[in-house]
């Protein structure tokens, strides 16, 4: 369990995200088709759908890792070109540099002195004692905690999570879900989570959307108290509704899921 060490005294809360008429294609295939989406500041939005529906592409466009073919993305009313450092993204692969220590991985790109900030971020994810270890000495769950600390040190107002827990075992996954939820509650940043796990989406999200072939086909507010009882009738009712829509989705075009 992570210690209650927080960077929140320097956090700026969540950012509002507004997407209008977003289009993106790869090699002649339309991946996003005029998608529009509004996410209020501080909301946790879960995004689910079959492989190839455009979920990861959407996050990469918000992170400015891909160019937009059409439409607009604004954060707090400002275009992405005017945003600096307020958006951070986590992937399924922690992407740690093997030749740098855990602490050095967290401090990459920061001006000196960065060590104290890095240690606070590491403490917040419960890994203070691993600061001087190499990434190869960590478990998969620990590596993802380091990746989370690396995002937190930049005090993001919008955190994008692209299947960060997908490769973890069931117990570690639950622990990471609890950690993400507790840190998000303290900092108040906005979160977009892409996941294939509908239960995870409902457990963490304030709202869930289902994507199909580059479009939003279902949108539900999750009006359940936290911490959520996954075995409750209300929880399973939402889960069944989302699962039914995902399972009835049309087959997605090939080639997008690697985007």
Curated annotation (Swiss-Prot):
Residues 17-238 form the ABC transporter domain. GO terms for cellular component: plasma membrane. Belongs to the ABC transporter superfamily. Aliphatic sulfonates importer (TC 3.A.1.17.2) family. It comes from the Bacteria. It catalyses: ATP + H2O + aliphatic sulfonate-[sulfonate-binding protein]Side 1 = ADP + phosphate + aliphatic sulfonateSide 2 + [sulfonate-binding protein]Side 1. GO terms for molecular function: ATP binding; ATP hydrolysis activity. Keywords: ATP-binding, Cell inner membrane, Cell membrane, Membrane, Nucleotide-binding, Plasmid, Translocase, Transport. It holds the Pfam family ABC_tran. This is Aliphatic sulfonates import ATP-binding protein SsuB 2. The complex is composed of two ATP-binding proteins (SsuB), two transmembrane proteins (SsuC) and a solute-binding protein (SsuA). InterPro entries: AAA+_ATPase, ABC_transporter-like_ATP-bd, ABC_transporter-like_CS, ABC_transporter_ATP-bind, P-loop_NTPase. It is found in: Cell inner membrane. Its main location: membrane. Its EC number is 7.6.2.14.
């Amino acid at each position: 369990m992570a210690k209650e060490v927080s960077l929140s005294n320097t956090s700026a809360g969540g950012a509002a995200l507004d997407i209008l008429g977003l289009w993106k294609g790869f090699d002649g295939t339309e991946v996003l088709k005029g998608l529009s989406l509004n996410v209020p500041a501080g909301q946790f939005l879960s995004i689910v759908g079959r492989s190839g529906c455009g979920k990861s592409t959407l996050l990469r466009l918000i992170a400015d890792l891909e160019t937009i073919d059409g439409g607009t993305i604004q954060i707090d009313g400002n275009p992405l070109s005017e945003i600096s450092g307020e958006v951070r993204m986590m992937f399924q692969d922690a992407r740690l540099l093997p030749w740098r220590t855990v602490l050095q991985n967290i401090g990459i790109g920061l001006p000196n002195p960065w060590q104290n900030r890095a240690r606070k971020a590491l403490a917040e994810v419960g890994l203070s004692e691993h600061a001087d270890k190499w990434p190869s000495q960590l478990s998969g769950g620990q590596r993802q905690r380091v990746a989370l600390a690396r995002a937190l040190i930049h005090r993001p107002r919008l955190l994008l999570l692209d299947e960060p827990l997908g490769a973890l075992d069931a117990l570690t996954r639950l622990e990471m879900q609890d950690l993400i939820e507790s840190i998000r509650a303290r900092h108040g940043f906005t979160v977009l989570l892409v996941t294939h796990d509908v239960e995870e989406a409902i457990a963490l999200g304030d709202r869930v959307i289902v994507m199909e072939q580059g479009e939003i086909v279902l949108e539900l507010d999750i009006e359940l108290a936290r911490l959520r009882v996954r075995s409750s009738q209300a929880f399973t009712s939402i889960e069944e509704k989302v699962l039914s829509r995902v399972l009835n989705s049309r087959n997605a075009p090939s080639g997008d899921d690697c985007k």
